[in-house]
From Swiss-Prot:
Organism: Glycine max
Record key words, sorted: Allergen, Pathogenesis-related protein, Plant defense
GO annotation, biological process: abscisic acid-activated signaling pathway; defense response
Function in brief: Involved in disease resistance.
Name under which the protein is recorded: Stress-induced protein SAM22
This protein's record includes keyword Ribonucleoprotein: no
Organism classification: Eukaryota, Viridiplantae, Streptophyta, Embryophyta, Tracheophyta
GO molecular function term, any single one: protein phosphatase inhibitor activity
Amino acid sequence: MGVFTFEDEINSPVAPATLYKALVTDADNVIPKALDSFKSVENVEGNGGPGTIKKITFLEDGETKFVLHKIESIDEANLGYSYSVVGGAALPDTAEKITFDSKLVAGPNGGSAGKLTVKYETKGDAEPNQDELKTGKAKADALFKAIEAYLLAHPDYN
Protein backbone atom coordinates (compact mmCIF):
# COMPACT_ATOMS: atom_id res chain seq x y z
CA MET A 1 0.00 0.00 0.00
CA GLY A 2 1.24 3.45 -0.90
CA VAL A 3 0.20 6.69 0.75
CA PHE A 4 0.25 9.87 -1.31
CA THR A 5 -0.40 13.19 0.41
CA PHE A 6 -1.63 16.40 -1.19
CA GLU A 7 -2.34 19.78 0.38
CA ASP A 8 -4.67 22.55 -0.71
CA GLU A 9 -6.00 25.85 0.59
CA ILE A 10 -9.18 27.70 -0.24
CA ASN A 11 -10.57 31.05 0.86
CA SER A 12 -14.18 32.06 1.34
CA PRO A 13 -16.00 35.28 2.24
CA VAL A 14 -18.18 33.23 4.64
CA ALA A 15 -17.27 33.33 8.36
CA PRO A 16 -15.52 30.17 9.65
CA ALA A 17 -18.21 29.12 12.16
CA THR A 18 -21.01 29.49 9.59
CA LEU A 19 -19.07 27.64 6.91
CA TYR A 20 -18.13 24.85 9.35
CA LYS A 21 -21.75 24.40 10.38
CA ALA A 22 -22.85 24.10 6.75
CA LEU A 23 -19.99 21.80 5.73
CA VAL A 24 -19.96 19.56 8.81
CA THR A 25 -22.70 19.75 11.43
CA ASP A 26 -25.59 20.58 9.08
CA ALA A 27 -24.17 19.13 5.85
CA ASP A 28 -26.88 16.46 5.55
CA ASN A 29 -29.45 19.26 5.15
CA VAL A 30 -27.40 21.91 3.34
CA ILE A 31 -25.76 19.82 0.60
CA PRO A 32 -29.02 18.66 -1.07
CA LYS A 33 -30.28 22.27 -0.95
CA ALA A 34 -27.06 23.70 -2.40
CA LEU A 35 -26.78 21.14 -5.21
CA ASP A 36 -29.77 19.68 -7.03
CA SER A 37 -27.66 16.69 -8.09
CA PHE A 38 -27.36 15.52 -4.45
CA LYS A 39 -30.45 13.53 -3.58
CA SER A 40 -29.90 12.24 -0.06
CA VAL A 41 -27.47 11.78 2.80
CA GLU A 42 -28.17 8.94 5.22
CA ASN A 43 -26.33 7.27 8.07
CA VAL A 44 -25.82 3.59 7.30
CA GLU A 45 -23.77 2.97 10.43
CA GLY A 46 -23.24 5.01 13.58
CA ASN A 47 -24.85 8.04 15.20
CA GLY A 48 -23.15 10.93 13.37
CA GLY A 49 -19.92 10.94 15.37
CA PRO A 50 -16.52 9.43 14.53
CA GLY A 51 -16.88 5.99 12.96
CA THR A 52 -20.20 6.88 11.31
CA ILE A 53 -20.55 5.80 7.69
CA LYS A 54 -22.81 7.94 5.50
CA LYS A 55 -24.22 7.07 2.11
CA ILE A 56 -24.45 10.12 -0.13
CA THR A 57 -26.65 9.58 -3.19
CA PHE A 58 -26.34 11.87 -6.21
CA LEU A 59 -26.99 12.10 -9.94
CA GLU A 60 -24.06 12.25 -12.34
CA ASP A 61 -24.43 12.10 -16.11
CA GLY A 62 -28.06 11.03 -15.68
CA GLU A 63 -27.08 8.07 -13.49
CA THR A 64 -27.81 7.61 -9.78
CA LYS A 65 -24.56 7.00 -7.90
CA PHE A 66 -23.43 6.97 -4.30
CA VAL A 67 -20.35 7.43 -2.19
CA LEU A 68 -19.61 6.00 1.26
CA HIS A 69 -18.11 8.57 3.59
CA LYS A 70 -16.65 7.56 7.00
CA ILE A 71 -16.26 10.22 9.67
CA GLU A 72 -12.78 9.90 11.19
CA SER A 73 -12.84 12.85 13.62
CA ILE A 74 -14.79 15.99 14.48
CA ASP A 75 -13.12 18.89 16.31
CA GLU A 76 -15.83 21.54 16.63
CA ALA A 77 -13.76 23.68 19.03
CA ASN A 78 -11.00 24.10 16.43
CA LEU A 79 -13.25 23.84 13.33
CA GLY A 80 -11.54 20.63 12.24
CA TYR A 81 -13.05 17.65 10.46
CA SER A 82 -11.68 14.45 8.98
CA TYR A 83 -13.47 11.91 6.82
CA SER A 84 -12.57 9.14 4.41
CA VAL A 85 -14.16 8.03 1.16
CA VAL A 86 -14.38 4.26 1.67
CA GLY A 87 -16.64 3.14 -1.18
CA GLY A 88 -18.81 4.07 -4.11
CA ALA A 89 -18.33 6.17 -7.22
CA ALA A 90 -15.72 8.53 -5.73
CA LEU A 91 -13.31 5.71 -4.80
CA PRO A 92 -11.17 4.60 -7.76
CA ASP A 93 -10.34 0.90 -8.13
CA THR A 94 -6.70 1.65 -7.28
CA ALA A 95 -7.55 3.25 -3.91
CA GLU A 96 -8.09 1.60 -0.54
CA LYS A 97 -9.46 4.88 0.84
CA ILE A 98 -9.03 8.63 0.48
CA THR A 99 -8.90 10.67 3.69
CA PHE A 100 -9.61 14.40 3.86
CA ASP A 101 -8.40 16.36 6.90
CA SER A 102 -9.75 19.90 6.95
CA LYS A 103 -9.51 22.91 9.22
CA LEU A 104 -11.09 26.34 8.92
CA VAL A 105 -9.50 29.46 10.35
CA ALA A 106 -10.31 33.16 10.19
CA GLY A 107 -9.50 34.65 6.82
CA PRO A 108 -9.41 38.18 5.47
CA ASN A 109 -12.39 40.51 5.89
CA GLY A 110 -14.31 38.21 8.25
CA GLY A 111 -14.14 35.26 5.87
CA SER A 112 -12.51 31.85 6.13
CA ALA A 113 -9.30 30.21 5.10
CA GLY A 114 -9.57 26.46 4.67
CA LYS A 115 -6.63 24.08 4.84
CA LEU A 116 -7.06 20.61 3.40
CA THR A 117 -4.75 17.60 3.50
CA VAL A 118 -5.69 14.64 1.31
CA LYS A 119 -4.18 11.21 2.02
CA TYR A 120 -4.68 8.86 -0.91
CA GLU A 121 -4.05 5.24 0.17
CA THR A 122 -3.57 2.93 -2.79
CA LYS A 123 -3.96 -0.81 -3.14
CA GLY A 124 -0.64 -2.59 -3.57
CA ASP A 125 1.91 -0.63 -5.58
CA ALA A 126 -0.66 1.39 -7.51
CA GLU A 127 -0.19 5.12 -7.91
CA PRO A 128 -3.00 7.66 -8.10
CA ASN A 129 -4.23 8.39 -11.60
CA GLN A 130 -3.51 12.08 -12.27
CA ASP A 131 -6.68 12.54 -14.34
CA GLU A 132 -8.80 11.05 -11.53
CA LEU A 133 -7.09 13.37 -9.03
CA LYS A 134 -7.81 16.43 -11.19
CA THR A 135 -11.43 15.36 -11.67
CA GLY A 136 -11.85 14.69 -7.95
CA LYS A 137 -10.40 18.08 -7.03
CA ALA A 138 -12.65 19.85 -9.52
CA LYS A 139 -15.72 18.10 -8.05
CA ALA A 140 -14.68 18.93 -4.48
CA ASP A 141 -14.06 22.57 -5.41
CA ALA A 142 -17.47 22.74 -7.13
CA LEU A 143 -19.18 21.31 -4.03
CA PHE A 144 -17.42 23.84 -1.79
CA LYS A 145 -18.33 26.75 -4.07
CA ALA A 146 -21.97 25.58 -4.30
CA ILE A 147 -22.27 25.50 -0.51
CA GLU A 148 -20.56 28.89 -0.30
CA ALA A 149 -23.01 30.30 -2.88
CA TYR A 150 -25.94 28.83 -0.94
CA LEU A 151 -24.73 30.53 2.25
CA LEU A 152 -24.19 33.86 0.50
CA ALA A 153 -27.70 33.64 -0.98
CA HIS A 154 -29.15 32.81 2.46
CA PRO A 155 -27.54 35.34 4.83
CA ASP A 156 -29.95 34.37 7.63
CA TYR A 157 -28.50 30.83 7.73
CA ASN A 158 -26.88 30.14 11.06
